[in-house]
Amino acid sequence: VGLLAITSADRLNAGWTAAQRAREYGSPQAVSHVERLLADVPSWCALVTVIDGHPATLAWLGSVVGHRTRSLGVEHFGQTGTIADLYAHFGIDARGIVAAAQAIVPGRPIRHASFL
């Protein structure tokens, strides 16, 4: 299991887009920060992205190196409740994250998930 905390999806995506554009215009050595971060993650690994915002914000990460991706986030706005209740509703609590990880890699049990 790997964990990547992204503080600015916008800047990370802008760097990736700039590197792609540079390669298209003849700079094959251009590599973005996110490409360096994900370069050592085997292609058979899957990514689960989680954001307290729209899931499309991080869904592009699977395209960087070609990983299967399950993006979790808030798809409908206007609900009220406690943070814990809302996170559970949208599947961005611990139980939802583990369920998404289990679903994207079927047959590979997640150890120590019984605490949920």
Residue ranges of each PLM-predicted region?
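Thiamine diphosphate
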Residues: 1-116
